[in-house]
């Protein structure tokens, strides 16, 4: 098992319930894939450094998790097909 960190940005037009539902969905992908979520840090709505698809704000969320090396690939696929995910990144935490 390896430690990973992901940050994803959701569309600012989402209401609070939709944002929370998406966070729970991504946590579920991690847990159903055999991983464990260690920390979820919701940063709220923040201004982007530059416009992405004509959007200048987004809901930021940081998630630390432990998983097998195959899980980040599946999580990346889920991020890509989910409407409303503006940007995401998954990195391996160095011990």
Swiss-Prot record:
Keyword rRNA-binding assigned: yes
Lineage: superkingdom: Bacteria
Swiss-Prot/TrEMBL GO biological process terms: translation
Gene Ontology molecular function terms on file: small ribosomal subunit rRNA binding; structural constituent of ribosome
Keywords: Ribonucleoprotein, Ribosomal protein, RNA-binding, rRNA-binding
Keyword Ribonucleoprotein: yes
NCBIfam families noted in UniProt: S6
Similarity annotation: Belongs to the bacterial ribosomal protein bS6 family.
UniProt name for this protein: Small ribosomal subunit protein bS6
Species assigned in the record: Clostridium beijerinckii (strain ATCC 51743 / NCIMB 8052) (Clostridium acetobutylicum)
Underlying gene: rpsF
């Amino acid at each position: 098992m390896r430690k990973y960190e992901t940050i994803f940005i959701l569309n600012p037009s989402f209401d609070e319930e939709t944002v929370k539902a998406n966070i729970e969905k991504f946590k579920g992908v991690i847990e159903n894939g055999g991983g464990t979520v260690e920390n979820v840090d919701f940063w709220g709505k923040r201004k982007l450094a530059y416009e992405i698809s004509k959007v200048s704000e987004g809901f930021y969320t940081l998630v630390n998790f432990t998983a097998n090396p195959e899980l980040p690939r599946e999580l990346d696929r889920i991020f890509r097909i989910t409407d409303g995910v503006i940007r995401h990144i998954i990195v391996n935490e160095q011990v």
